[in-house]
Amino acid sequence: MPTGDYDSKPSWADQVEEEGIDVEPLSPQIKKQDPASFVLDTPREVINGNIKTITEYKLNDKDKKIKIVRTFKIETLKASKVVAHRKNWKKFGNSEYDPPGPNVATTTVSDDVLMTFITNKEDLNNQEEEDPMNKLKGQKIVSCRICKGDHWTTRCPYKDTLGPMQKELAEQLGLSTADKEKAPGAEPEPAQAPVSKTGKYVPPSLRDGGSRRGESMQPNRRADDNATIRVTNLSEDTRETDLQELFRPFGSISRIYLAKDKTTGQSKGFAFISFHRREDAARAIAGVSGFGYDHLILNVEWAKPSTN
């Protein structure tokens, strides 16, 4: 039986098994070449807009011809002159005949590293000038006449509740707080002694208050307890200034204590207000108890005297 060297063509079943990859037998000349140079045809490039498609044919491990299609997106980036000049260098070694651009077989492309140079010298000429508007951020430019907040009076959230109540109380009392302090029944302020401007030594007996008798703090504390009221059902956003504006129309206030949470700083819902006169405290209980304030109904009553 005669024999001869001939190339066997793959069957149709083998082509389907290779999932549609073009398969061609190897010629004897190709088999003698180095496997690293098994590039059958010159890669074909097709550029469509900013999409570049490269098609080439190579041999796999089974000595079969395969088709490789690579798609690239072209992006134009601005680079410095030094970088552009470095890209035009002539390649050498295994990449001597490579096209422009990196080759994954010989080149590893990593992320760009941005370098920041820090100098010890401070450039005083490039310091940013201070914005005069930043200085006014911490200052209170606008003050509300009703709640003393940092907004206009026409935009006060308590305009419909606190404003009418203050006007009604002022009409019932018939006097403003400033007029009440000037009334005949009010205690006159003690006259201040003239201050010596000569720089000479003044004995304690001749100084301001030296001729008066010392007063004990215990009677004043008892008087405060008798004219102290307790306000409950306050909102968490209540401040001392809100209580001052709410109870000031009834009389002179000596002390305000608002219970606050140590961690959050918000109100615990109750406070103590001490008046100079018990009559003012009684009017405050009658006027504010049951009053709606900040969507809550306030409860005002006499505070229990302390046992200390």
Curated annotation (Swiss-Prot):
A GO molecular function held by the record: RNA binding
SMART domains: RRM
Region of interest (Disordered), ranges: 1-35, 176-227
A Pfam family: eIF3g
GO BP of this protein: formation of cytoplasmic translation initiation complex; translational initiation
Quaternary data: Component of the eukaryotic translation initiation factor 3 (eIF-3) complex, which is composed of 13 subunits: eif3a, eif3b, eif3c, eif3d, eif3e, eif3f, eif3g, eif3h, eif3i, eif3j, eif3k, eif3l and eif3m.
Cellular component terms per the entry's GO annotation: eukaryotic 43S preinitiation complex; eukaryotic 48S preinitiation complex; eukaryotic translation initiation factor 3 complex
Subcellular location(s) per record: Cytoplasm
Major location category of this protein: cytoplasm
Record's keyword annotation contains Protein biosynthesis: yes
Bias kind Basic and acidic residues: ranges: 209-227
Top-level lineage group: Eukaryota
Function noted in UniProt: RNA-binding component of the eukaryotic translation initiation factor 3 (eIF-3) complex, which is involved in protein synthesis of a specialized repertoire of mRNAs and, together with other initiation factors, stimulates binding of mRNA and methionyl-tRNAi to the 40S ribosome. The eIF-3 complex specifically targets and initiates translation of a subset of mRNAs involved in cell proliferation. This subunit can bind 18S rRNA.
Cross-referenced SUPFAM superfamilies: RNA-binding domain, RBD (SSF54928)
Bias-annotated ranges (Low complexity): 185-194
Recorded coiled-coil stretches: none
InterPro entries the UniProt entry points to: eIF3_g, eIF3g_N, eIF3G_RRM, Nucleotide-bd_a/b_plait_sf, RBD_domain_sf, RRM_dom
Name by which UniProt lists this protein: Eukaryotic translation initiation factor 3 subunit G-B
Disulfide linkage: none
Recorded family membership: Belongs to the eIF-3 subunit G family.
Keywords: Cytoplasm, Initiation factor, Protein biosynthesis, RNA-binding
All residue ranges annotated as the RRM domain in the record: 227-305
